[in-house]
């Protein structure tokens, strides 16, 4: 491995990733996270369908895998759902500017839950990402973080799946989490 954050990004680009995993840089390490379970697609589609009408002007909402880079924090994340100004995506680089994000959502897995609820909360909040939504699939609850500041997020609201959760500005809408649970059986 080469030195520093830029070296880690280069190493990540050259990494041969096993099928079923995606690489991220978390806590100064290259971490392989599993691809989502099949039913996560249903949940992601419901989130996108509800938020799309409330997107800030000129922004795009997507589930395409992209690596958003936060050089100051030496982190690079590949969120499950992301929204950013269209200009953020207008690059030939695979490393997108994390500070261009207006919304991020992560659906936790057993292996990613801790980082989704700690490291990513801190990095997204300090970077100024207006809204970070964590769908805690293990605890069947939705957690939304808002009001980013240099200290991190100032607000946090939690609702169990099946209830409605307010998504703060720049969206200013309500997310219905009915049907976010895993299929039975």
Predicted features by range, described:
Residues 1-185:
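Gly/Pro/Ser/Thr-rich low-complexity, intrinsically disordered segments predominantly at protein N-termini
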């Amino acid at each position: 491995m080469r030195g520093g954050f830029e070296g880690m990004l280069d190493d990540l680009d050259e990494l041969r990733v096993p099928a079923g995993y995606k690489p991220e840089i978390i806590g100064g390490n290259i971490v392989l996270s599993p691809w989502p379970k099949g039913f996560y697609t249903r949940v992601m589609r419901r989130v996108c369908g509800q938020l799309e009408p409330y997107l800030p002007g000129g922004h795009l909402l997507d589930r395409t895998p992209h690596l958003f880079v936060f050089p100051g924090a030496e982190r690079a994340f590949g969120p499950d759902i992301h929204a950013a100004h269209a200009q953020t995506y207008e690059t030939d680089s695979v490393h997108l500017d994390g500070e261009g994000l207006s919304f991020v959502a992560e659906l936790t897995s057993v292996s990613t839950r801790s980082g989704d609820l700690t490291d990513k909360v801190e990095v997204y909040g300090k970077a100024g990402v207006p809204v970070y939504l964590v769908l805690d699939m293990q605890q069947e609850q939705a957690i939304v973080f808002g009001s980013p500041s240099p200290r991190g997020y100032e607000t946090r609201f939690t609702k169990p799946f099946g209830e409605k959760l307010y998504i703060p500005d720049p969206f200013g809408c309500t997310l219905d989490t009915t049907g976010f649970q895993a299929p039975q059986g």
